């Protein structure tokens, strides 16, 4: 029996580099989806224009290169600059990946531990930014990892590593009302800055066994050698994989699956799942997990060096 696939369109509009643009066709069940990523090289006006042009013409929009929200304990703060990007989008759901991160990444860490792919017990883990991956942070702690959070190191250029979820939550509650009003570019590499390497606070990379979190932070600040390290991240291209291999990375784990030779950002995957569901807003954690399991969407593992 044949069927007519219902084609849907998901687009991620990113403040990141246009050099990382990609396009892929994905089939989930009986639905075919065109998934694409378009970077604006840090141009907020262009990103806002693209958002408004796509409103009502695609099934879901991913917001990349920035976060819309950050969480401090149970309080959610909105990045003022990011909110302006989507202020006039009325008809198409916009997803920044935060809704999916908690469920997808928590599930991944539990799976890695359960299947003994990575034994986190007493393993030293650097999470380059914990506030945008609190679910991953909690899962790592539950798995027995010894955590170092790089939020102040890499986000604010302050040499103060944090070593517990409690201290991370305390600092987040103190600083979130302030930093969410600052230009995003002060906190996060975007546009051409994503392609520049400026190693910083290298000792925290070197003294940890696992480096986890946002790849743009990892790529920008990592030292030349990461011999024997495990990287848990997302949004890597083929050239990124080659760079990590040359750096001596042992195992690369991407939280999102590879499509056409690269892993897309969490915002893309969240938008894809919302589009498949036909929803007009973000889903619940249970709904995300159900869709991930139904369509057998799995993370990617690649041993780069023996």
Predicted regions and their residues:
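Metallocofactor- and cofactor-centric catalytic cores in central/energy metabolism, strongly enriched
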Residues: 2-122, 143, 212-213, 227-235, ...
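Active-site rim beta-loop-alpha module in soluble metabolic enzymes
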Residues: 157-217
């Amino acid at each position: 029996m044949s069927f007519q696939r219902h084609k849907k369109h998901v687009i991620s509009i990113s403040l990141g580099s246009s050099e990382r643009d990609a396009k892929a066709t994905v089939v989930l069940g009986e639905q075919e989806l065109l998934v694409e990523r378009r970077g604006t090289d840090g141009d907020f006006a262009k990103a806002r224009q693209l958002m408004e042009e796509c409103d009502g013409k695609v099934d879901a929009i991913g917001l990349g290169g920035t976060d819309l929200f950050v969480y401090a304990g149970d309080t959610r703060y909105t990045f003022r600059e990011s909110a302006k990007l989507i202020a006039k989008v009325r008809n198409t759901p916009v997803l920044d990946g935060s809704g999916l991160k908690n469920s997808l990444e928590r599930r991944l860490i539990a799976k890695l531990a359960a299947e003994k792919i990575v034994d986190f017990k007493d393993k030293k883990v650097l999470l380059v930014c914990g506030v945008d991956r609190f679910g991953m942070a909690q899962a790592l702690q539950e798995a027995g990892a010894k955590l170092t959070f790089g939020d102040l190191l890499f986000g604010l250029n302050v040499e103060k590593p944090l070593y517990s979820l409690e201290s991370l939550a305390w600092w987040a509650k103190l600083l979130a009302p302030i930093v969410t009003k600052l230009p995003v570019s002060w906190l996060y590499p975007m546009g051409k800055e994503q392609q520049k390497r400026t190693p910083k606070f290298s000792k925290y990379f070197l003294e940890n066994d696992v480096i986890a979190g946002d790849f743009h932070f990892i790529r920008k600040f990592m030292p030349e050698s990461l011999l024997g390290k495990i990287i848990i991240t997302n949004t890597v291209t083929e050239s990124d994989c080659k760079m990590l291999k040359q750096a001596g990375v042992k195992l690369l784990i991407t939280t999102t699956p590879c499509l056409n030779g690269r892993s897309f950002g969490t915002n893309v995957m969240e938008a894809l799942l919302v589009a498949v569901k036909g929803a007009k807003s973000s889903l619940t954690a249970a709904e995300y997990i159900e869709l991930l399991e139904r369509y057998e969407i799995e993370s990617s593992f690649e041993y780069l060096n023996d």
